[in-house]
Amino acid sequence: GATTSRLHTAVKIAPAYHAPVVHVKDASRSVPVLNQLLSPNTRRKFLDELETGYRQLRESYSTSRKNNLYISLAEARANKLKTDWDHVQIIPPARPGIHVFRDFPLEEIEPFISWMFFFIVWQIRGKFPELLDDPVHGKEARKLYADALTLLDRIKMEKLLRANAVVGLYPANSVGDDIEVYRDESRSEILAVFRNLRNQEQKKPGVPNLCLADFIAPRSSLQIDYIGAFAVTAGIGADQLAEEFRQKNDDYSAIMVKTLADRLAEAFTELIHAKVRRELWGYASNENLSLDDLLMERYIGIRPAHGYPACPDHSEKQTLFTLLEAEKNARITLTENFSMVPAASVSGLIFAHPFSQYFFVDKIGRDQVEDYALRKNVNPETIEKWLASNLNYR
């Protein structure tokens, strides 16, 4: 899943278990792996290649750890992204506040589906639609595509999956590495505070140590800035439909349901983000991009998701969900470990800063762990548990 990685499996998990441990990016990829493990003809070769790959990852990781140099949190903050906020055009949202989309038509979401990523889930790589004519994988790809479209048509006709979303657009300012979200432009009432982490790698001259707070005007600048938050799902009904197929011993269709729900959720997120840029916020009202342009992220701004490299702490989803009232407005909930239910859901923040970019927080030092724990009002051990794969001292 998204919270795991092949590197973490190779370095931390596999050495601690007596039997083979295989990392897959999501559940739908388990079937091809299991087929190779269960077949006497492929099992040994698969496991040998797996262990070779893991060994290479461990060696590469060990070398990089020795070569990587880290700086103190104070030094990293001194090397933050420098923005002349007096010369940045900050555009207030055209329609601030909460926007709720319930039972959004799947027909409008479908054009935003990335079929290339659909095929990657089934371990078929290539550019779509050229992939359908590939001499090696074309036949299999065409069957998968036809099956997916047939099921998607049934889902749309019988309304078997439902898509909901909630978006919030608010005044905001950064205070240090945190982002304060306000009820209105008086900034007298704080609705939420997002705690962020800063990259601590030693950089080349002129390269900043980034933090998401760098993309929001500091309160000390006297500028009122803005931030967006969103939670999107296209998975309401997916578990029930998949279970119906499983009861009929049709695991293929059960996996297809989950795969389509995931693709629809990502497509819905793309649609909602475009709607925010062009209409609700309107900071890119003249934007006219193709689907390929959207998937290549050729738009202004970013939408980082908690649990991913720029903001690896999943627990910050709780702040996001409380701010958006995501359970009431979109029927999305969080588990005790901050996974989203339905699984085919996406959430995160929206930044409009013209130079905002995705980046890796990567490894952080004990000084940042202690600072972050203080800001979140938890003990450092809790942070070490949540961010175990992000520590540079273990």
Label each region the model flagged.
Residues 2-5, 23-25:
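Conserved phosphate-binding/catalytic loops in two-lobed NTP-binding clefts
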Residues 3-17:
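Glycine-rich, charge-decorated loop segments at or immediately adjacent to ligand/cofactor-binding or catalytic sites
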Residues 7, 11, 28-32, 262, ...:
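Residues on a specific face of well-ordered alpha-helices
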Residues 13-28:
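Structural recognition of alpha->loop->beta junctions
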Residues 14, 35, 39-43, 124-127, ...:
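Non-catalytic alpha-helical coupling and interface elements of nucleotide-dependent molecular machines
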Residues 25-255, 259, 278-280, 289:
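Active-site loops and adjacent core secondary-structure elements that bind or stabilize anionic groups
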Residues 209-215, 220-394:
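C-terminal accessory domains/tails appended to large, multi-domain proteins
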